[in-house]
């Protein structure tokens, strides 16, 4: 009669060991869940960035305003008849 409770206790201990320390244990599950959440956040950020780049590409294909804006900012475009002013911050 004493064998059955001991056998059940050993079985329970083995199952608990696998649950906490074995392959696919609870700590591994928690770590994987955290990793998935971080990856989902990174995917959301990259999706937003991709959408901005797609909009920028579409604007460059369709409109000349974006091309002119880039030429002014990156290449220093000044049209004929325009005067360029640069305002520097005061040094104090």
From Swiss-Prot:
Which segments sit on the Cytoplasmic face? 1-3
Regions crossing the membrane: 4-21
Q: Which residues form a coiled coil?
A: 31-74
Q: Which GO terms describe its biological process?
A: FtsZ-dependent cytokinesis
Topology feature Periplasmic, residues = 22-92
Its domain of life? Bacteria
Q: How does it sit in the membrane?
A: Single-pass type II membrane protein
Q: Which UniProt keywords apply?
A: Cell cycle, Cell division, Cell inner membrane, Cell membrane, Coiled coil, Membrane, Transmembrane, Transmembrane helix
Would the keyword Cell inner membrane turn up in this protein's UniProt record? yes
Example of a GO cellular component annotation carried by this entry: cell septum
Pfam families the record matches: DivIC (PF04977)
Explain the purpose of this protein: Essential cell division protein. May link together the upstream cell division proteins, which are predominantly cytoplasmic, with the downstream cell division proteins, which are predominantly periplasmic.
Q: Which family does it belong to?
A: Belongs to the FtsB family.
Could you describe the subunit structure of this protein? Part of a complex composed of FtsB, FtsL and FtsQ.
Please state what the protein is called: Cell division protein FtsB
* Gene this chain is encoded by: ftsB
